[in-house]
């Protein structure tokens, strides 16, 4: 009887734990043209999946779109990336220039933010990734090293699965900003043979917010589980009566 009860309880726990166990894309920017036109120099800053906003901060500009070839975008053609520049002068604007992304995680848990980034030769070698739980105050997550010029660095990741308050949050936000070389008061160029210039470019692609849908038991499964509990109770009462 005991082994049966434990087995039934284990099954019930499994039933109520069932849900969407894989990560889903909540919001994503591929920067490809909404209507494919075969030109990588055109694109869109509207999300290709979900809803959210992406903005340039600190005076950074977007002079154009450019090829996303080399990023993780699976598009065989019409693969665009968001070209950004105007990162300021040497020694100024530390942690203040880059992009800001806002996307709700309501209905999701184990949230992850990821992006691909191409550093030009004279762009800032180091980028600081930040997150915000209220959309206003940002917390440093990690400094990433882009130590090769004219190179894509794919799947940069901010994993918030262990951060209290990131799940089911309508005010979630992220930033990727140029930062001084660690322990210094200035920027380094991605190509060690070059000198940093604010006119250097960062090109973004596959900017994504992902998460696991909050598990909700299916009605039929839940009913079956409750029926199992009722059966356990009935057998227990019958055993006591015997």
Which residues make up each language-model segment?
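Sec/Tat signal peptide C-region and signal peptidase I cleavage site
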Residues: 18-23
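Terminal, low-complexity interaction segments
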Residues: 26-35, 138, 142-214
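Short, tryptophan-glycine- and acidic/Ser/Thr-enriched carbohydrate-recognition patches
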Residues: 34-66
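Surface-exposed, low-complexity/disordered Ser/Thr/Gly/Pro/Asn-rich loops and linkers
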Residues: 54-106
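Extended extracellular/luminal ectodomain segments enriched in beta-structured repeat modules
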Residues: 105-114, 169
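Extended, low-complexity, turn-rich repeat/linker tracts enriched in Gly/Pro/Ser/Thr and Asp/Glu
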Residues: 107, 118-125
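Conserved Ser/Thr-centered positions that define the repeating blades of beta-propeller domains
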Residues: 129-132
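A short, hydrophobic C-terminal helix/tail in secreted or cell-surface proteins
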Residues: 218-236
